[in-house]
Amino acid sequence: MLMNKPLVLVTWLDAKDGQTGWHSIEDIQKERLATCHSTGWLMYKDETKIIIMADYSEFDDDKEGGRHITIPSGWVQNITYLKEDDKEKQNEHG
């Protein structure tokens, strides 16, 4: 099943909580987003979201995935295709 799914590194932005306690308004206004890096098989991609899955298991006839994440497309900064032959699939997935 996964032979046709590209292995990718996704760089994306996420919300970041501030520390508890009192802080100056100036310091609060300087807060930044967290930059995240996630790897896995690119399972789905459209204009609103991408889904990557990090783990895959086969046992008898069961095929299951784990550690998947759905990321809003607007949060994605970059998608790097990790295997040379997957770079050709880049055009298929955006």
Language model features with spans:
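Conserved RNA-binding domains used in RNP assembly and mRNA/RNA metabolism
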Residues: L2-G94
